[in-house]
Every structure is written in structure tokens, then in C-alpha cells.
Amino acid sequence: MSGGLLKALRSDSYVELSEYRDQHFRGDNEEQEKLLKKSCTLYVGNLSFYTTEEQIYELFSKSGDIKKIIMGLDKMKKTACGFCFVEYYSRADAENAMRYINGTRLDDRIIRTDWDAGFKEGRQYGRGRSGGQVRDEYREDYDAGRGGYGKLAQKQ
């Protein structure tokens, strides 16, 4: 049974795919595009390192029934590193999350959602050299919600 608050807002409109494509996708662009168009999985980015799985669930379950949440982890420290994947049971529920949750605030951060071709084991780890996300390696500004200064800026 779905208690999704946003289910009532459902429409027949289609949520467009963004220009972003996973550079590590194993397959060609056509195959990735096909998977993205039928996917029930969202990539959620710009999370605080302190955002919990429970907070993600509370927000994203307003769009429908969630099958699984996979928190992004620093591959060295195994701590949260600012992203996650949210998998819904239905495409319609995932579309509602894209429509209504993308660009909202969570933990004082504007989060972004994007379609994902489907979670595969190993993708929960950051791809940066230090184990976190690549963007956090090069950031020169101070961001308390994402561990302070970027990793490379800290070394200087």
C-alpha cells in the first residue's frame, strides 16, 4: 500500500532526461539511454555528509514506495560522502520525485536528483582519488556540510 503524499499529483507528463551520463557505464550511449528511460532509480547528489538514510527515506517516500536506498560511501573510510541512490518500485513514483523533490532543501543543502540506469555493486563508493567524490577533491571553498575544504586544497 502506498501512502505517497505526492501520488495525488501524478500526471501523464514525462520527466525529461538530463544531459548527464555516467562516464563509467558499461555499454554504449544507446543502451544507457534506453535504461534511463525505463529506470526506477534516482541518483541524489549534493547531500551533506551528515544526512542520514532515515532523512532520505522520510523525504523521498513522499513520492511513493521506496524499494531501496543505497548511501554513497567514501571507499577508504566507508563514511557518507554526499550522494545516494533511491530505487522506487514504479517509474511513476520515481518521476514524481524528479518533479517535486529535485532542487529542494535537505539539511540546509539544495539537493539534485537525476535518472540512474540502475545501481550495480561498487557504485556506492566515491570515485575520487582520496575515496570520496571527485568534486570534493578540487573544491577550494569551505563547505561544512561536505567536510570543510576540498582534499587537494587541504594539502596545500
UniProtKB/Swiss-Prot annotation:
Record family assignment: Belongs to the RRM NCBP2 family.
UniProt GO MF annotations: mRNA binding; RNA 7-methylguanosine cap binding; snRNA binding
Main location: nucleus
Chain spans, region Disordered: 124-156
Subunit and interaction comment: Component of the nuclear cap-binding complex (CBC), a heterodimer composed of NCBP1/CBP80 and NCBP2/CBP20 that interacts with m7GpppG-capped RNA. Found in a U snRNA export complex with PHAX/RNUXA, NCBP1/CBP80, NCBP2/CBP20, RAN, XPO1 and m7G-capped RNA. Interacts with PHAX/RNUXA, EIF4G1, HNRNPF, HNRNPH1 and ALYREF/THOC4/ALY. Interacts with SRRT/ARS2 and KPNA3.
Domain named RRM: residues: 40-118
Name assigned to this protein: Nuclear cap-binding protein subunit 2
Species, as recorded: Mus musculus (Mouse)
Protein location: Nucleus; Cytoplasm
